[in-house]
Amino acid sequence: VTLEGFRPSSYLTSETARLQETVGNGKAIAAVSGGVDSTVAALVAKRALGERLLPVFIDTGFLRAGEPENVKARLGDPSLGLKVKLVKAGGRFLEATKGEAMAEEKRKKFRETFYQVLGEEARKDGCDFVVQGTIAPDWIETQGGIKTQHNILEQVGIDSLSKYGFRVVEPMSELYKDQVRVLGRHLDLPKDMSERQPFPGPGLLVRCIGTVSKKKLDLLKSSTMIVEEKLGPFNYDQYFAGVIENKFAKEPVYKNLDETAAGALGLPSSETRVDVFEDRVTGVKGETRSYGRVA
């Protein structure tokens, strides 16, 4: 479905019917984060299931300062009507990812902990289904090996029912971000929410380069607040802060790096020095994943 051919009213009608058929007389949890994808998915599910939908927000500890409480209040506004259950699990996520420096492994450990917590909440509330805001780029990036998106399970062979005790329902798994925003506006989602800048599911965990610690997280939360406050008014597509250890590789990593940088900057090589950090970051070259050091 192209953006030009996307009809939010028709899509909403078909997905509402599909959700009702899938869940039947049962109950479902909606995993919400405050982002546009999970919020729109929850609103679609709310139309289909009414009071049989329980929105759950997991505080992973990797969120912006004050975000859990802000999201709960915002989604609970009468205009949206999503009564969110807030689950505090920051210590558990920090312990699960402690000592891990590799970005992909951090994402996988986050995913495992996230769904363990969701499964526990589903059992507590008698829910057999979890509704989440997976969109097409999530499973495309995961299957393509670019990076593991934490909300991808069945597309990579993980049976959520046998492993976590619930079935996943994804009402927007074939949509792209622009289409989700159109659907959000159709559902009267406020503009600051429908147009909100993407924030990764694992949150600041993946912007904390290398191993994660409370000290680095606290610094990243304060830095994120400053960056978003200063750059927000310019409406850039994306901007964010990251934290990396101030440790550099002891041996040369790339040949002639100083000369290359000098040429790019138009400076004499005698006046140019390039240091390369020890920790590695994830990037994309062309359409393939790249994992390397930062200079």
Question: Where are the model-predicted features located?
Answer:
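ATP/NTP-dependent adenylation/nucleotidyl-transfer catalytic domains that generate, transfer
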Residues: V1-A295
